[in-house]
Amino acid sequence: NGGSTLRSGYEHAGLEKNNGGSLTIADEDKNGKLTAWGGQQGAGIGGGSGKDGSNIFITGGGVNAIGGLAAAGIGGGLSGSGSNITISGGKVGATNGLNGAGIGGGQHGSGSNITISGGEVNAIGGKSGAGIGGGHTGDGSDIIISGGEVSASGGENGAGIGGGVYGKGEGITVSGNAQLKVRGGSVHGDYGTGAGIGGGGSYGTDGAEVEPDICALNPGGKIEYYAPRSSMSGTPNKTVTNPTGDFVWDSGTVTTPATCTGKGVRTYT
């Protein structure tokens, strides 16, 4: 209940959680707030310098995580990866000023096995980092957005969801009733823009867009793509929905999940 602020020193995370065990942030009374500032090279929530940030679960509350120089907002510190991060509720902001992902890897770190199933999430990558995924030169993979309202913005040259500068993005799934907004990072110097979903930019080349798996995206879910530097409250450049329509059943209840056999095609056996 109430509000708590954690502010760390050099090479340490605001709320430090390195490789061992797990960390759960919960708010049963729905009125708690946590702000965590990482010191230089430390994540807001996750790893200190040279450390990974893994097995982090946020189920509720107002959480604001600000990574220090070269570290993620939520995830790895400098040279650390962010993995097994799950957000299922709450209002979560995750930002970094330079070279780290909003949620995922610190500078030179990857972001993987990241799941968002609910809540309001705003992830902003630092310069050359992804909003959700890899930090500077890091890849972003196995990222699932299955619910909630999610906004992911890459820093300069970073993908909205996927890789940081020079990093790849792959294994990205958007499903359920997810409301997702993505924006790749802008050109910086001779380095190209980041993809909305996909890879980060590289020298003279824009990041490659990757088509996410939307087979299990419900008719109420959508992905909105915004241009670099554009306002994410305006009209998107592109909106993606699942071409599958609503299902009408004559009787009974579907108890076995569908198998996705193609874009917009679900098979029940």
Residue ranges and their predicted role:
Residues 1-248:
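A composition-driven surface/loop motif
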